[in-house]
């Protein structure tokens, strides 16, 4: 079927619009304010600015610890490598003009939405920062802070500054993920015309750029805060704060990162899945046109959603995970060192920063190990990209074991317990093995090479209902193995830490919680490579859409289809990895919360008795919060999808020539509808997550005051946090796995199995996929952030619960 001249030239705009312009969005490429400022500086001024910045950073590092200097050096080198990867990717050709036109439209939509979304988030962040400032100006101080002369005003400004820096870095992490994705997609599409391996290499290196920046920013942001506070407060000098108490000042950074990540994930998830579901229901089910077909008015909105939902949101999510894990481990390391009277506690406090610095090194090696194949062509057999990615991951795992052993011997050796470092190294191995097992479990339940997804696809042959039943049962079943693995990991790491030989003044073992923290670090010790695999998914998905819309040969589409299917699996495995790390990190944050309450109340706070009615109610409220949050997130996608469906149907009715390529769809209208709806819908579930723990803690604090239970508010919040974490882990596992399985069952049928595209089995699978979309890309990932944000917000707000 021939297309008219305008469609052949890929003029993806409304009739009255200029190229690369969407209604209600913007008319020129958006760049953040800091980028625009840097562009206006000449090279000499920029060089001087960078030298002064680096000089200041290294000065503070040298005043703090040689370990901090090492962290700074590694982070800066990783940033330089990320610049190299960017230049390498951008040097690749963009392909023919029709590909470039489509890519420009996607980039405009993604950047325009992110500008509006981040503008909304920044306003809420400043409002919340003001609330935190007011609370901290009237809160109590810990005895250690009072002894060091740290007043309420200084403590308030420190926490607010940390919160805003965490929010800023989290926002940049998300923007970076989107920035590279919208520029790499067309280059992957172009490379797919030549060879599958070259396309794979470009997608991986583009994802690697984003991953290195995200992890590097999380590490260097905390390191800069730590060294700044260390120098400014003159830590460890007579009459000043002890270094073991310093990590408590960093909790605002974790809360800021969580705050931005939650709204980025909610807004991006609602956008991407609202557009995806709407496009699929009308395009595939009602009109039988292929995915990413240029006749579908919602296709550009769908492709934009891949970037703002999967790239920007996931970058902020992983940034927040790493920041929360580092801060909680630093708090626990400082607490343990203080109890054990370790002469130099800096190694135990800074150990998480060193582990993630090595993560940048080993993940870079893993990323660079994936190379193109010489003399390959589009006609060559398509090598399984998952095998290639798995080789890189295996190499990264091996290097992680070696560097983890070196780190523990360097930083965790103490004469009080000479073999303790070996026990903690074993804790790290537990975490590394847990990460590998989680990745394998996620692949097993979501890859169509294995039985669960094929069984789900077979259920599609008997109708829509059986597909839904099979998908729900698969998701429920998939929670069992991960929970068993997490349980074994926590118990093993706790036991290894407890038997490390580190004891307090009374002779009690004190290394258990820190052992669990080290296991969490082990699990996240390959986070940069795992994030690379995750970023690979949406880039490959976008590349496939560009190939389809630009009417490339079927052989090219076959390559991008393979990359897309693997990308779906890597996204699913990354979500499994993320929820596993979130589970361990939340356990650490819960322990850190109890330590902080003990410090503020100056009494022991080690147990939470759920036999107390008020405490049990707190647990129920925590469990309810997870279900209500998930319901509101899914409902938001449903309402957005309804608006898209109505708009697409309207265009098909009013412009019947669309199906025959005689009229052009109004892509911009769908983009504007989805963007507006996503920004509106993200507020309610986000506000629920932030307000609930604060309100519950404050109400029960008042109740405790009148009933003679001074710690009741803190206990109820602890129960709420505990139950929400447990329910959140299970709910996220169910939602992520069921959604990923539904998606890949559809893709398995699209390979030609069970009747192939257009068959009744395929239509049933599409229905399952639309149900699973908000599960795996909106509610599920948002719960990862939610359970960690609940922990960080309780850390920051702990004083008002007492």
UniProtKB/Swiss-Prot annotation:
InterPro entries: PPase-energised_H-pump. The chain crosses the membrane at residues 41-61, 66-86, 118-138, 160-180, 206-226, 246-266, 348-368, 386-406, 421-441, 468-491, 511-531, 577-597, 615-635, 686-706, 716-736, 782-802. Mg(2+) 2 binds at residues 276, 773. Pfam families: H_PPase. Substrate binds at residues 273, 776. Mg(2+) 1 binds at residues 276, 280. Its EC number is 7.1.3.1. This is Pyrophosphate-energized membrane proton pump 3. It comes from Arabidopsis thaliana. The lineage of its organism: Eukaryota, Viridiplantae, Streptophyta, Embryophyta, Tracheophyta.
